[in-house]
Regions:
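Hydrophobic alpha-helical transmembrane segments
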Residues: 1-81, 89, 93-95, 105-125
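Short basic (Lys/Arg) and small-residue
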Residues: 100
Length: 125
């Protein structure tokens, strides 16, 4: 949407909203193209969302089950953003870069554990 290296002019109203949507889709496209984990998690969501709709015991349970899947995607996008910024800063090893990347990875892991817990509770208890 924006040329690399060029800062877009400030926008207001509908123009700002349309640009925001463009940036959103740019981010989704970039994450999909560059992150295998995001593609795998998206595939899992595409497969599991209909399972939640079919087997979920009620509307709230279905919403929570699908919401837990979407949370994994959100956290993966944030993790990818962290990794991208850390990688841009430099290629040499740095303890702070390691901590940032490890924390992002841990956040994705916790979101995945959340899916398991939510689904077990919704389907079996």
């Amino acid at each position: 949407m924006t040329e690399p290296g060029k800062v877009p002019d400030k926008a207001t109203g509908l123009t700002r909203i349309m640009r925001a949507f463009g940036y959103t889709f740019d981010g989704l496209k970039a994450t999909f193209k560059s992150e295998a984990a995001f593609r795998q998690e998206l595939l899992a969501c595409v497969i599991l969302a209909p399972v939640a709709l079919y087997y979920g015991p009620g509307g709230i349970a279905k919403a929570v089950m699908i919401g837990s899947l979407m949370l994994v995607l959100v956290v993966e996008i944030i993790n990818s953003a962290i990794e991208s910024v850390v990688n841009r800063h430099g290629t040499e090893w740095n303890i702070h870069a390691k901590l940032a990347k490890d924390a992002g990875s841990a956040a994705v892991f916790i979101a995945c554990c959340n899916v398991g817990i939510v689904w077990l509770l919704c389907l079996f208890f």
